[in-house]
Structure formats: structure tokens, C-alpha cells
A protein has these predicted regions:
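Acyltransferase donor/substrate-recognition loop-hinge adjacent to the catalytic core
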Residues: 1-13
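Acyl-donor binding region in acyl/amide transferases
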Residues: 11-184
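Flexible, glycine-/basic-rich loop-and-beta segments that form/coincide
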Residues: 184-192
Length: 192
């Protein structure tokens, strides 16, 4: 497909058990990180134009601890522990390689930001107030997140969640967040 983003009739389809194998296969085959199970609470979408799958999104539990996000919110350890469930991680985003459409990725992110809170509420009985994502700096610039009004809050140290010896074994990632509620900081218990 090579349409202008404005000419694409975008829709998000929540992936059910019947579509899970296909979603996993696309991610395994075409996403640079491949397939790994998503952590904690999670939600997956196919992004379609009519019946054609253009892209895939995966959302899951937020990272337990990341200094740029925690500092941006104004969290201490106790408030993070109490309210982390209100942050959701955009853990996978894949526009399929044969899809060429300028501005499509930012349109998809904007659509997901509108749709996800109510879907999450329906499934998990609470409404998230902030999205986060991690963009590998050596591979990507985060242009689609910037164009969709996400906020860059800093970089990881390149340690990863399992690095207890400070060996810096994973790529540095840019941390981006997207408020889903204008009072997100108050609702998260942040202090500024």
C-alpha cells in the first residue's frame, strides 16, 4: 500500500484469541525485537484500512522503574508503587514493511491514544492516565512519537531491567510519554 495517510480509512481492531497467533507471527517475523510475551496487563491491536492489516500495536504493563519517566512525573518509590498500574507501555509498534504512507505512524498513535483508555477500562476496570514507550536511539529517532505529541523525557542508561551489576549491556533508549488525562500528574501522585 502506498496511500497518503489522510486517504487511509484507519481502524483499530482489538486482537482476540483467534487473532493472537497472527499478531505474534507478524511481530516475530517483522519487528526488530521479534516476539516475546508482553508483561502484565496487556492489549494488542491490528491497525487496518478496510480489511487490510497495515500495522500492529501492543500495550502492556509499564516499566517498573525508569528515572526519566519517574522524574518527569515527580514520583518517589512509594507513589510509583501505588500508581504504576495507571501507566501503560506501548511495548510494540510495527508498521508492516510493505506499507508506505507518510504520517501514517503518527496518525496511528493518535488514534490509539484516543481508543486505548476505554478499551483498558472495559478489560481491566481502571483507566490509565499516561502512556510510555522506549525508542532505541541507535535505530530510530522517535519522529512519529514527536509528531503525535508525545513528550520526550530523557534517556535510559542502557542497563536493562535485569542488570543488577551496572554492566550497561543493552542499547540506550529514549523515553517518551503521552498524557491520556490533563491531570495525569495529580492522578499519578506526582510532585512538581
Amino acid at each position: 500500500i502506498s496511500k497518503k495517510a489522510g486517504d487511509v480509512d484507519l481502524s483499530l481492531e482489538l486482537v482476540d484469541k483467534g487473532g493472537l497467533k497472527l499478531w505474534n507471527e507478524f511481530i516475530d517475523r517483522y519487528h526488530y525485537l521479534g516476539y516475546n510475551p508482553l508483561p502484565g496487563a496487556q492489549m494488542r491491536y491490528f491497525v487496518k484500512d478496510q480489511d487490510e492489516i497495515l500495522a500492529l500495536l501492543g500495550f502492556s504493563a509499564a516499566a517498573w522503574k525508569t528515572a526519566p519517566r519517574d522524574s518527569f512525573i515527580g514520583w518517589d518509590a512509594q507513589r510509583r508503587k501505588q500508581n504504576l498500574h495507571l501507566v501503560v507501555n506501548n511495548s510494540r509498534f510495527l508498521v508492516l514493511p510493505w506499507v508506505q504512507s507518510k504520517n501514517l505512524a503518527s496518525r496511528i498513535l493518535a488514534l490509539a491514544g484516543k481508543r486505548l483508555p476505554s478499551d483498558w477500562q472495559d478489560r481491566y476496570h481502571y483507566r490509565p492516565v499516561l502512556l510510555e514507550t522506549f525508542v532505541e536511539k541507535e535505530r530510530f529517532e522517535g519522529t512519529c512519537y514527536k509528531a503525535a505529541n508525545w513528550i520526550y523525557v530523557g534517556d535510559t542508561q542502557g542497563r536493562g531491567k535485569l542488570d543488577i551489576r551496572h554492566e550497561h549491556k543493552v542499547p540506550v533508549k529514549a523515553v517518551w510519554v503521552y498524557p491520556l488525562h490533563r491531570r495525569y500528574r495529580d492522578l499519578l501522585g506526582g510532585v512538581r
